[in-house]
């Protein structure tokens, strides 16, 4: 089976991309265990706890990221450069455990994937 990467690169709640990506990720996990999840650019904000989406009349789907472990989705990476550019660091508490990687290491991990879906 092919290895599938889910890349979250958009901020939460501005569009439905993050929620749709999470739904697709959880659905795909029922079909394969060979999944990798990447958070890059503004996608790093998907993992911040304590968001208030109701203020912009959006659904709070961020807590659903906590289910990744229950779905045996364990390969999660977050771009260290994206964290720094946004004033965050690897010590920031996130809703899931994601391993910080520099851009070159992130590209190597992505290169190991057969299919890349970006949200």
Swiss-Prot record:
One of its GO terms (biological process) is tRNA processing. GO terms for cellular component: cytoplasm. SUPFAM superfamilies: DsrEFH-like (SSF75169). InterPro entries: DsrEFH-like (IPR027396), Sulphur_relay_DsrE/F-like (IPR003787), Sulphur_relay_TusC (IPR037450), Sulphur_relay_TusC/DsrF (IPR017462). Keywords: Cytoplasm, tRNA processing. Belongs to the DsrF/TusC family. Part of a sulfur-relay system required for 2-thiolation of 5-methylaminomethyl-2-thiouridine (mnm(5)s(2)U) at tRNA wobble positions. Heterohexamer, formed by a dimer of trimers. The hexameric TusBCD complex contains 2 copies each of TusB, TusC and TusD. The TusBCD complex interacts with TusE. This is Protein TusC. It comes from Escherichia coli O127:H6 (strain E2348/69 / EPEC). The lineage of its organism: Bacteria, Pseudomonadati, Pseudomonadota, Gammaproteobacteria, Enterobacterales.
